[in-house]
Amino acid sequence: YCSVLTGLRRKSILMRMEKIEATAAARLTTMPTRDDLRLAVETRGPIDAPAVLFAHGFGQSRHAWARAAEGLAAHGWHAVTFDARGHGDSGRLADGRYALEQFVDDLLTVARSLAAPPVLVGASMGGLLGLVAAGETRPDPFRALVLVDITPRWESEGVERMLDFMRAHPHGFASLDDAADAVAAYLPQRRRRKDRYELAQLLHRGEDGRLRWHWDPALLDTVAREGERHQQRLLKAARNIDVPVLLVSGGRSDIVSDATVAEFLQAVPHARHVEIPHATHTLAGDDNAAFAVAIEPFLTTLDPDAVPASHAHAAVQRGLP
């Protein structure tokens, strides 16, 4: 009897695991922009469930959010990730003249393709695009907003350090190990072996056989040209946001500081703030588990129509608020 029961339990566990894997499996498609580029869009989870839309940071791609998207899809969310223009598998501008408005419009295009306004989770650049879209667009394009280590103002030295890293290898890398060495020097807190697959998603092999970052180098000119001049606009947009907001910051971030967080919370008094003490600017990648713990209570406080029943039930079972 015991052996039969053990076998049934094992079969039940395997069936649940297969169901979770099938639910979290990614579906890749493309979506046209207003100016006829194609955006690479990846979805996970039931398409009729409440949606979470992930927007990646500058120089990243949709793969930066893969683990977080898989986790939410397994809990019943419709998780959507996409490559911003000029990044990953999305289209690039022939003239290389990227502008903030284009990125915001692309974000709104993806959001409006969904059945209802999604929760937006935006890291760095993705969070800034979310701020502009949420603060300058009515009706509200998002059900709620999660900003990941970004505020309307930022510490310039941290941004310059990031840009220096991105400019440092114009001729690419001979191997994945060489690229890993470069990232390890810039992000020593990362566990190198664990990140090799994710690192490979950020690179592409050119005709000369060398590996280069999977984004348009012309984007660096855009940041240098437009960067800080948008900060007042971003702060004004933040003051206009009336949906629930969560700011998740890294305690070791060199881009977000106590001062920039305080200014943001004064501008958006209803916003909540969670700090992950050991994390840097790349906090979701530094510790995805800690990031998930930080955002889950916020997601469960949204109204019932915005939270999958399976996610809310799981949260209650674990004693989350």
Residue spans for each PLM region:
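Catalytic histidine neighborhood in serine/cysteine hydrolases
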Residues: V268-H281
